[in-house]
Amino acid sequence: LIAVLDRLFYSSHFDKTMKVGASVVCARRGGCSATFDELNKYFTIANMPIASSQYWNSIHGRGPGEASEDEEGKQTMRVLARNMAFLMKSIALGKEQFGLPEAEEHVWTHFIR
């Protein structure tokens, strides 16, 4: 997945500004928070708002069908879906009424200049 996202975010030239992103991760046990963090970095580097939920967007399960038994994870996904839909509608309305925020020309530095 990371290889695909590298290609999509660094090699493609379509504007991703103000397109809503949301990461969803699934694991047997540990590793969700680190993966969630890594995936969200793609959105933040591309001027994309991130939809959130009531907890990190993760669900747990090892084998086929096990994730469907994670009640808290399923609730997190439902809340995420509603929040993402609201955020997308809000951005569309704001864009229609106020336009997009003014873009600045990107300045490249090496942390000291």
Name each region found by the language model.
Residues L1-Y55:
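Helix-loop-strand module that forms the ligand-binding subsite of alpha/beta enzymes
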Residues P49-R113:
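Glycine-rich phosphate/pyrophosphate-binding loop and the adjoining helix
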